[in-house]
């Protein structure tokens, strides 16, 4: 699918190894507010390159403030309430339901962990990752 013709891409300048400057994030929040209002963009549709193309993209980096964006209405985040996945919880299906391309499960897991766990060191889901994934999955149902 040609995502570029039906999306708006925003590039932020960052070397990939440090947090984004506050002024840059403040400007981004202002721009996103305008775009959301003008185009009626749903909250869940604010995503990163790696979320839509996990096999080809690895940005934004782990320092990107996804939680802060979510607090302003841009993108989904999870709450801190305990949630234990059901015994029949299927992590790969959950990744697919929340929007990840799971044809390459390792890439999908890596992108999920970069976005929601700020982790790129491991490529498997641990119990904490599965709990977060379960919380997000429940929001999509």
Place the predicted regions along the sequence by residue:
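Short coil-to-beta-strand
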Residues: 1-9
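A generic structural motif
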Residues: 13-19
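Basic/polar, cationic surfaces and motifs that engage anionic cell-wall
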Residues: 21-141
